[in-house]
Design a protein with these regions (language model features):
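Beta-strand-turn-beta hairpins that frame and shape the catalytic cleft
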Residues: 25-32, 189-200, 235-238, 306-313
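Active-site environment of divalent metal-dependent phosphoester hydrolases
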Residues: 39-43, 66-71, 162-173, 190, ...
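Binuclear metal-dependent phosphoesterase catalytic core
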Residues: 40, 189-195, 211, 215, ...
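Core catalytic region of metal-dependent phosphoesterases/phosphodiesterases
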Residues: 44-193
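Active-site-proximal segments of metal-dependent phosphoesterases and phosphodiesterases across multiple
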Residues: 128-140, 238-290
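Binuclear metal-dependent hydrolase catalytic cores centered on His/Asp/Glu-rich metal-binding motifs
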Residues: 194-237, 257-258, 272-278
């Protein structure tokens, strides 16, 4: 017997009342949007917030490496012009050109800073002053991001959980204070719905770049074990761990010679040598605990999905310099992932 659309809707409504009468939850799954490695890109951050509304998600997860890598001074030359050492050098005239460059710098994941010629000379003469200024601007920018996210997400009833990555300084991540709709999940276990707890870890195994939060495999293993030990229902666990598990196909990068600085690609037979840069400790943890999903990043060019046992591993990748937001929609239910989709926008 084929039911009309109206009768079908009435039946579904009655079934919902029946489930509530039995004390059964109406909600069968939670929709997550996950993106990572924004590296300070203002354009990607704007798209992340928009994705929460566009995809109608309940949970937003912002993975590690959220801060930028470079500070670009915009120098007032005192004659109505401005100069910036950015993409070959820029000479600007008028407020409109300056605003355009500010947007370009911010969208690409860098920070701009206005200064006079004399202040620029002081900065050139003191690495300590540059480092202090850079840290201040990183911190202020991230706090502004959180404020914007709270304002936007409060209208949707969506909660965003953010973590740092190995490229982010601990003191910058520690400066993020929880708001009603934005939570600093770094190195915590967070309950994201009635069924699921999420392990959040932003460290990485050692890299050739010697980043602020590179750690040994032993330290990674100890921290992961500490976090997982507090989970009550491990069959419904979600991992949000920045570095991918080793040799999973989502951690493939060119091998670098770190005996020189900056590190250089290793070539063999005229071709770059590729290898799995992921973590052995994280792979062991996934094999041992079998979370329903592992949300990772770190390796921008290894976008994709794979499985380790029952665990779905997702690396959405990153194209932040182009302002392209790579992400993943993940629908999780009781002890399983119901569906997932990689996104670009």
């Amino acid at each position: 017997m084929k039911l009309s659309r109206r009768k079908t809707l009435v039946l579904l409504h009655l079934l919902g009342d029946y489930r509530r009468w039995l004390g059964m939850p109406d909600k069968k799954f939670t929709k997550i949007f996950f993106a990572t490695d924004l590296h300070g890109s203002g354009k990607c951050f704007d798209k992340l917030l928009s994705a929460a509304k566009f995809y109608k998600v309940e949970v937003l997860v912002l993975g590690g490496d959220i801060t930028g890598k470079m500070l670009v001074p915009i120098v007032d030359m005192g004659d109505g012009s401005f100069k910036a050492d950015y993409i070959g050098g820029k000479t600007l005239h008028g407020a409109e050109e300056v605003k355009s460059l500010e947007r370009e710098i911010s969208d690409s994941g860098y920070y701009y800073y206005h200064c006079s010629k004399s202040e620029m000379e002081e900065l050139n003469a003191s690495k300590e002053k540059v480092d202090k200024l850079f840290m201040t601007i990183m911190k202020d920018t991230l706090i502004k991001w959180v404020d914007r996210a709270e304002t936007f997400l409060s209208q949707l009833g969506v909660t965003c959980y953010l973590t740092g990555g190995n490229d982010d300084y601990q003191e910058i991540i520690d400066a993020v204070r929880d708001t009603p709709h934005v939570k600093n999940a770094d190195h915590k276990v967070i309950k994201i719905d009635e069924l699921h707890e999420m392990v959040n870890l932003g460290w990485s195994n050692p890299t050739p770049w010697k980043c602020p939060r590179d750690h040994t495999e032993e330290e990674l293993e100890a921290m992961t074990e500490k976090l997982v030990s507090s989970i009550s229902d491990k069959e419904n666990c979600v991992f949000n761990i920045h570095v991918p598990p080793v040799d999973c196909g989502l951690d493939t990068v060119p091998k670098l010679d770190d005996s020189v600085y900056p590190p250089k690609p290793v070539f063999q037979g005229g071709q770059a040598v590729m290898f799995g840069a992921g973590s052995t400790a994280i792979r062991r943890a996934i094999e041992k605990y079998q979370p329903i999903v592992d949300l990772c990043g770190h390796v921008h060019e290894s976008r994709g999905t794979t499985r380790i046992g029952r665990t779905l591993v997702i690396n959405p990748g990153s194209d932040y310099p182009e302002g392209m937001l790579r992400g993943a929609i993940v629908n999780i239910g009781d002890k399983k992932v119901l569906s997932f989709q990689l996104t670009s926008g």
